[in-house]
């Protein structure tokens, strides 16, 4: 019985140790990705002249047609 309890405790401590290691690795990766994403977001942001408001002030805005709705499929007729 004593050996079984110590092996369970050993397994539990190993599991917790691995969990802590993986959480630290995951934390460092997420901070790294946040640092990488920030400059990209700044570059993607459009300047005010390209926004809808800028186009309205600059001239007539081209009219965009709404997305066409998918045609409803005809229900198969069940003949008897």
UniProtKB/Swiss-Prot annotation:
Q: List all Basic residues biased stretches.
A: 70-80
Give the signal peptide as a residue range, or say none if absent.
1-27
Gene Ontology terms, cellular component aspect? apoplast; endoplasmic reticulum; Golgi apparatus; perinuclear endoplasmic reticulum; plasma membrane; secretory vesicle
Q: What induces it?
A: Induced by drought, salt stress, ethylene (ET) and salicylic acid (SA), mainly in shoots.
Asked whether the keyword Signal is assigned, the reply is yes
Would the keyword Lyase turn up in this protein's UniProt record?
Answer: no
Q: Which GO terms describe its molecular function?
A: LRR domain binding; receptor serine/threonine kinase binding
**Protein localization:** Cell membrane; Secreted, Extracellular space, Apoplast; Endoplasmic reticulum; Golgi apparatus
Q: In this UniProt entry, which cysteines form S-S bonds?
A: none
Q: Name one GO biological process term.
A: response to salt stress
Keywords for this entry?
Apoplast, Cell membrane, Cleavage on pair of basic residues, Endoplasmic reticulum, Golgi apparatus, Membrane, Secreted, Signal
Reported tissue expression: Mostly expressed in leaves, and, to a lower extent, in roots, stems, siliques, seeds and flowers.
Family assignment from sequence similarity: Belongs to the serine rich endogenous peptide (SCOOP) phytocytokine family.
Q: Write out the function statement from the record.
A: Brassicaceae-specific phytocytokine (plant endogenous peptide released into the apoplast) perceived by MIK2 in a BAK1/SERK3 and SERK4 coreceptors-dependent manner, that modulates various physiological and antimicrobial processes including growth prevention and reactive oxygen species (ROS) response regulation.
**Subunit text:** Interacts with MIK2 (via extracellular leucine-rich repeat domain); this interaction triggers the formation of complex between MIK2 and the BAK1/SERK3 and SERK4 coreceptors, and subsequent BAK1 activation by phosphorylation.
The entry's protein name is Secreted transmembrane peptide 3
Organism from which the protein derives: Arabidopsis thaliana
